Amino acid sequence: MTTPAKKVGFTCGAFDLCHAGHMLVFKEAKTVCDHLIVFLQDDPSIDRAKNKPVMSLPERQIILAGIKYVDEVRIYTTEVDLYEKLKNLKADIRIIGADWKGKQFTGHDLPFEVYYNSRSHNFSTSALRERVYLAEYAKRH
């Protein structure tokens, strides 16, 4: 009797200030794959209009590696770098936010099934940054 092949999935991002929303993304991702690869971007502000991460790459890598839903963490620098890595990736499914429906994303032309995460929550890194800022501001004033 042969063992069924494991379904490999992947998701990509900076995953700065890892929060409950990220956990829900990874948890949902594991419902559509057996092995989850997280592509971690070093600094998204390099080639896109995104915030520079607060946490260092090693900090984010250590946190991601410790999450029970994440099986593997791989690093990429730019969207071009990510595309090159995805071209050679042996995976079945890409997990991406529902806000990307109808939009072009890096690797949209590659032969991966796409699963749009539901995002049935209001957690976000931007909201967390603001909460921390307001809490620190309140302590000082």
Regions found by a protein language model. Name each.
Residues 1-141:
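Nucleotidyltransferase catalytic core that binds NTPs
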